[in-house]
Regions:
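Structured catalytic-domain cores with a bias toward divalent-metal coordination
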Residues: 1-298
Length: 298
């Protein structure tokens, strides 16, 4: 909030700093201290429910009813390793999805994922109401850095420019950014049983089809489950804690089936070509958005 000036804003900007304040104070991370529920799993909420249900209900009624766009800024849980990326709504009216994609493409990320969920999460549910929405994912392990904060501030400002809300021209640093590519598919792997988790890869790493992602072992070292990929993919985020409860998230990964070049043309690849092409897309290098995109922003 301190980085923005009212004179530079077109329209009304509503900033929600910490929503689950009690959970933040109690260090319960993704769940509320009062009822153990994840706020990002209960939307649209319930006026007669528990604390978290009521909080979601309040946001849905008092915030979503007043906004035209929604930007959610997140990071990974304390037990998660995560590579930066951005979600946009995919289960929403066609024009809402298209506008959300435009927002996601203004972020300095290697790729964006269209979520097909229409409930539970705040931005997902906002999308079903016709509100173009994105969710920025950056940072993990319950830690933060000045660089990550600055990167998310840069993303928010550029998204605001993209939707015509921020009137300032981008600085040179804000113009130095990657062009995020659409990651067509995202998959989520859960553990069926409780045990000890031994991940073999890291978030952001490219994994070939058939490679071992990790093993779940019992307390005596016996393998309960092992997890392998059926196609080449990149690890979006994964659990890194030793302890894994039953039916809990382990890994999220994504992949392309059609690639888009810098001119916006789509093309198919063979299996080996696709692996090489994905690596080029996933490599953490800085690019610069096209002049046309910046003219659209400013």
């Amino acid at each position: 909030a301190a980085k923005l000036q009212p004179k530079d804003i077109k329209g009304i900007l509503i900033l929600l700093h910490i929503v689950n304040v009690n959970g933040f104070k109690a260090r319960t991370v993704s769940v509320s201290a009062e009822d153990g529920k994840n706020l990002n799993r209960v939307f649209p909420g319930d006026a007669n429910g528990t604390y978290t249900d009521k909080l979601a209900y309040f946001i849905e009624k008092e915030i979503f009813s007043k906004i035209d766009y929604y930007i959610d800024v997140h990071n990974g849980d304390w037990f998660e390793d995560l590579t930066p990326f951005i979600y946009c709504v995919g289960n929403a009216p066609e024009e809402t999805v298209a506008e959300a994609e435009r927002m996601a493409q203004a972020a300095d990320m290697p790729f964006y994922v269209k979520s097909q969920s229409g409930k539970g999460g705040a931005y997902n549910y906002a999308g079903t109401l016709g509100i173009p929405s994105v969710l920025i994912e950056r940072g993990c392990n319950g830690m933060w850095s000045e660089e990550e904060v600055a990167a998310s501030q840069k993303d928010v400002k550029n998204i605001l420019r993209r939707i015509g809300m921020l009137k300032t021209r981008p600085t040179l640093a804000e113009m130095q950014m990657r062009v995020p590519k659409h990651m067509n598919h995202a998959h989520y792997v859960d553990s069926e049983k409780a045990g000890c988790w031994f991940p073999k890869k890291k978030a952001g790493q490219i994994v070939k089809a058939g490679e071992l992602l990790g093993e779940l072992k019992d307390y005596f070292g016996n393998v309960i489950e092992e997890f392998r990929l059926k196609e080449d993919a990149i690890i979006l985020y994964q659990t890194i804690s030793y302890s894994v409860p039953e039916n809990s998230p382990l890994i999220a990964y994504g992949h392309y089936d059609i690639c888009i070049d810098d001119m916006g043309n789509t093309h198919q690849h063979t299996h080996d070509e696709l692996h090489k092409h994905r690596k080029e897309h996933y490599d953490d290098h800085a690019g610069i958005h096209s002049r046309e995109m910046w003219e659209d922003m400013i």
